[in-house]
A protein has these predicted regions:
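A structural motif corresponding to the C-terminal end of an alpha-helix
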Residues: 35-41, 126-129, 181-194
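Short acidic/histidine-rich active-site segments
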Residues: 127-152, 160-165, 170-171
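Extended, charged catalytic domains and RNA/DNA-binding interfaces, predominantly
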Residues: 1-110, 117-125, 131, 152-159, ...
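Mid-to-C-terminal alpha-helical segments outside catalytic/metal-binding sites
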Residues: 164-213
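Short, surface-exposed alpha-helical recognition segments that flank or form part
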Residues: 44, 111, 169, 173
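Active-site micro-motifs of SAM-dependent methyltransferase domains
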Residues: 71, 140, 205
Length: 213
């Protein structure tokens, strides 16, 4: 196991998720972060609230990540991250994976690969070319029961949200269409050097830093 989500949307013993009033990182949570640093597991804050996230970023001795998120500057949603949150994690050596999960994109299920590229560019302008990568959050092959679980606290309790139809942006709906993203970023004027970083080189570098490989 190389990456662990510290909270999933709501409160647990470590801290607070992004759908609740955030009480911050607990004392036990600090022990968890220290142990994850020791054994080489990356702290993932994608579903974590802003206060807990900030305290994990400051507590961790290794880079942490939002492995799959989008900027709230393009769409307000509890799962999306503010410009300040994105800048804070990057300024402290962390990493941002930009997701293509349609409900969090500005145009929802009407999004295209260019809308996803816009989200990448928005994030890139905040975090810089070395702290950004792809965070697909692909969920192909799962039935409605899976999404019902995701939208309830702890998978079964109170409902937190409704996703509606789940479909990836047109042009990058499967892993097989990933070359389309490379082509799109190049066509939008990004240098090949930067596109290589976004498409995977940056992830390799940050994971080596955490895992020690």
């Amino acid at each position: 196991m190389g990456v662990v989500q510290l909270c999933y949307n709501t409160q647990n013993l470590v801290g607070t998720g992004c759908y609740e009033r955030d009480g911050g990182l607990s004392g036990f949570g600090r022990e968890v972060v220290a142990e994850m640093n020791r054994v080489g597991i990356m702290c993932d804050l994608s579903h974590v609230g802003p206060t807990t996230s900030e305290e994990v970023i400051l507590e961790s001795k290794k880079p942490v990540c939002y492995s799959h998120c989008l900027p709230s500057g393009l769409k307000q949603h509890p799962r999306n991250k503010s410009d300040a949150e994105l800048k804070f994690i990057a300024d402290h050596g962390g990493f941002v994976g930009v997701t293509m999960f349609a409900p969090f994109l500005a145009k929802g299920i009407d999004s295209t690969i260019d809308d996803y590229a816009e989200a990448i560019e928005y994030t890139l302008n905040i975090v810089g070319e070395d702290a950004i990568g792809i965070g697909t959050d692909f969920t192909q092959g799962h039935g409605q029961d899976f999404f019902e679980m995701l939208t309830h606290d702890k998978g079964y309790a109170r409902r937190l949200t409704r996703f509606g139809t789940i479909i990836n942006p047109l042009g990058i709906r499967t892993v097989g269409e990933f070359p389309n993203l490379t082509e799109t970023l190049l066509k939008r004027g990004h240098p090949e050097r930067v596109v290589r970083k976004i498409m995977g080189e940056n992830w390799v570098n940050v994971l080596k830093d955490v895992w020690g490989e």
